[in-house]
Amino acid sequence: VRNHLLLALLNGKEYSGINNSYAHDFLKDVNNEDFRFCSIVFLIDKYAAFIESIPSKEQWLIKYSLCNIFEEACRRFGDGYGTDLALNEGIVGIVKFHKAENILAIAQNICEELQAYMKRFDCTLSCSVGTPCDNMFSVSASYSTAISNAHYRFFLGQGSVITPEAVKTIKIKQNNTLKDMDLKWSNVIASIKSCDMDAIAKSVGSSFQCLDMDKNMISFRSAYFRMISLLNSFINDYLLYKKEALNYKLDMLFERDYETIDDACSGITDFCCELSEEFRQLKGSKTNKDIFALVNKFVLKNYTDRSLTLSKIADE
């Protein structure tokens, strides 16, 4: 009943008609003028590695323990309730705190305790704080803000405490740094053709640095799609003999759900280096064939010359 009520509140459903003593106890003081309410989302970083390395039963126990630690920490400021996220990548909680308290300080304090617990499993958490509200029945708006802002972990990195104020600052700083992205992606393609791995790392890093400065997820996805399209064209133009295998890897890059921009940069860099190595081998093979054709032509023309030697062929 408790988790059912909590998820209902977070999703904006009304439970005014429930005649249940537990529900009544859970919803008491929702209009207490001395308190405010806020939803906080905690995402487990590197979640794919988390579910691969930890048995499913232990995963449930870890999240259950996180909820208990969250609620215990909240009692120092007022009260709190936690439950599993519906998408299973962490937990979500509602903290009830005195109006005199600062929600950012509360969130950081709670996050530190949860981080200390997760260190036992070599894991970290990212925390996204919603907008505080005066009524618990309005906490769905706070939850919506927390979920929306959680996407900024992609730019701010794992282990971040993401607040509405931080996101607002990011949006103010967003600008038109993407105008020259086509030129930057062209530089990436040029570095692949140069077969210089350091140049590839530098050009890809410069491109993603520009995207990181903008911190706009919509713009990032558009630019990332453009990069994938250019790499696909490169494969079709130069590496057609390996098209199927390389396109499969490219599709995986496009569909992969990266947690941070650094992960995306690393994935693109590795793939570009692989393309460059294939291109280098192709150029080497073509050069060898051209040399063989020239040698063969020269020998056929001069095979009757008794002075013909390997040195003379090489000189020619």
Where are these regions (language model features)?
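Interdomain helical linkers/hinges and coiled-coil/dimerization scaffolds
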Residues: V1-N109, T131-F154, Q158-I192, A199, ...
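A broad structural signal for alpha-helix termini and local helix breaks/kinks
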Residues: L10, G78, Y238-L239, Y303
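Short coil/turn segments at secondary-structure boundaries
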Residues: Y22, K202-V204, T309-I313
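Cytosolic nucleotide-binding catalytic cores of signal-transduction proteins
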Residues: I69-G93, F97-L104, C111-M136, H151-G157, ...
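Alpha-helical bundle regulatory/interaction domains
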Residues: V167-N302, D315-E316
